[in-house]
From Swiss-Prot:
SUPFAM superfamilies the record matches: Nucleic acid-binding proteins
Example GO BP: translation
Pfam families per UniProt: Ribosom_S12_S23
Full protein name: Small ribosomal subunit protein uS12
Cysteine pairs bridged by disulfides in the record: none
Organism: Campylobacter jejuni subsp. jejuni serotype O:2 (strain ATCC 700819 / NCTC 11168)
Keywords on record: Methylation, Ribonucleoprotein, Ribosomal protein, RNA-binding, rRNA-binding, tRNA-binding
Assembly description: Part of the 30S ribosomal subunit. Contacts proteins S8 and S17. May interact with IF1 in the 30S initiation complex.
GO cellular component: small ribosomal subunit
Modified positions (3-methylthioaspartic acid) in chain numbering: 89
Taxon lineage: Bacteria, Pseudomonadati, Campylobacterota, Epsilonproteobacteria, Campylobacterales
Family (UniProt): Belongs to the universal ribosomal protein uS12 family.
Amino acid sequence: MPTINQLVRKERKKVLEKSKSPALKNCPQRRGVCTRVYTTTPKKPNSALRKVAKVRLTSGFEVISYIGGEGHNLQEHSIVLVRGGRVKDLPGVKYHIVRGALDTAGVAKRTVSRSKYGAKRPKAGAAK
């Protein structure tokens, strides 16, 4: 424990919080261009082909971001909106692509949790 005199000479060091999504540069979302769209496999014990895209952001960073939902229309040179949020079973994937924004289409025939997947509200009689 330091003495009062030691604290007067040199104050306590502030604990700095490290950002979980540094490429966004404190913005809620960033626009970017897909440089590669591909699938990758998750860590053990999970097994799947997860859809991801390498995106060059307007902040200058190139990040790997996850494409959520069933099916997508993304290809190279698509303009996308990227938000923070990691994927636990994909190492190095710390960002998500926002569905229904810019070139990314919403998930078709989605009826629950629609706002998360950019799906419009279905017509009254069509959903049954």
